[in-house]
Swiss-Prot record:
The chain crosses the membrane at residues 3-23, 31-51, 53-73, 93-113, 146-166. This is NADH-quinone oxidoreductase subunit J. Gene3D superfamilies: NADH-ubiquinone/plastoquinone oxidoreductase chain 6, subunit NuoJ (1.20.120.1200). It comes from Rhodobacter capsulatus. The gene is nuoJ. Its EC number is 7.1.1.-. It catalyses: a quinone + NADH + 5 H(+)(in) = a quinol + NAD(+) + 4 H(+)(out). It holds the Pfam family Oxidored_q3. NDH-1 shuttles electrons from NADH, via FMN and iron-sulfur (Fe-S) centers, to quinones in the respiratory chain. The immediate electron acceptor for the enzyme in this species is believed to be ubiquinone. Couples the redox reaction to proton translocation (for every two electrons transferred, four hydrogen ions are translocated across the cytoplasmic membrane), and thus conserves the redox energy in a proton gradient. Disruption phenotype: No functional NADH-quinone oxidoreductase complex. Cells lacking this gene have a nearly normal respiratory growth phenotype on lactate, however they are unable to perform anaerobic photosynthesis. It is suggested that in R.capsulatus this complex may function in reverse flow under physiological conditions. InterPro entries: NADH_UbQ/plastoQ_OxRdtase_su6, Nuo/plastoQ_OxRdtase_6_NuoJ. Keywords: Membrane, NAD, Quinone, Translocase, Transmembrane, Transmembrane helix, Ubiquinone. Belongs to the complex I subunit 6 family. GO terms for molecular function: NADH dehydrogenase (ubiquinone) activity; quinone binding. It comes from the Bacteria.
Length: 202
């Protein structure tokens, strides 16, 4: 058994076991940790297949952002998971049926999957010999699709700014300090001498 085959079986077994533990874990924090291990194992499989860019995306996006967000949400929110677990019994038959349908679809797809011999020659941009996957993808994005790539970045930037503007609300019922008005006020008018008579208020 070569090192490649051993690493493949190791990552595959760890990914399957960790995925099962995500579903079977009673503690939600443990489930998120098992989910992180599943993503890391899947990233290892992508590296073995030569898709190191996809592996880096999987680690940065899913492990570094989504899974950590899940972990913080689970740890910070006071959720009664015991009550939620009791309600899952009602939806178990429907969930099992959906799982069987999805499993049948995956099995059908694997049985009829067939790759043509001329598929590699029909690629839009085949990778040159001796060039890594990440380098080839970078050359395509920043050479052939440079303007489209920059346009996609601008669309994401506009979407981010729009989300900030939608959530930014200026409340009028809160007293705020107007620093600009204070800086431009006349010092002679800032103080006012008031002669208060005994027994009277302002």
């Amino acid at each position: 058994m070569t090192v490649f085959v051993f690493a493949f079986y190791l990552f595959a077994v760890v990914a399957v076991v960790a995925g099962l533990m995500v579903v079977l874990s009673k503690n939600p924090v443990h489930a998120v940790l098992w989910l992180i291990l599943t993503f890391l194992s899947a990233a290892g499989l992508f590296v073995l297949m030569g898709a190191e860019f996809v592996a880096m995306l999987l680690i940065i996006v899913y492990v570094g952002a989504v899974a950590v967000l899940f972990l913080f949400v689970v740890m910070m929110l006071d959720i009664d998971f015991a009550a939620l677990r009791g309600q899952l019994v009602r939806y178990a038959p429907v969930g099992g049926l959906i799982a069987l349908v999805m499993l049948a679809q995956l099995a059908t797809g694997l049985m009829v999957w067939n790759t043509a011999d001329a598929a590699n020659g029909l690629r839009a941009a085949p990778a040159p010999e001796g060039v890594e996957n990440t380098a080839a993808l970078g050359m395509i994005l920043y050479d052939r699709y440079l303007y489209l790539f920059q346009g996609a970045g601008l669309v994401l930037l506009v979407a981010m700014i729009g989300a900030i503007l939608l959530t930014l609300r200026h409340r009028t019922d809160i007293k705020r300090q107007n620093v600009l008005a204070q800086m431009h006020r006349d010092p002679a008018k800032a103080l006012e001498m008031v002669d208060v008579k005994p027994g009277q208020g302002l």
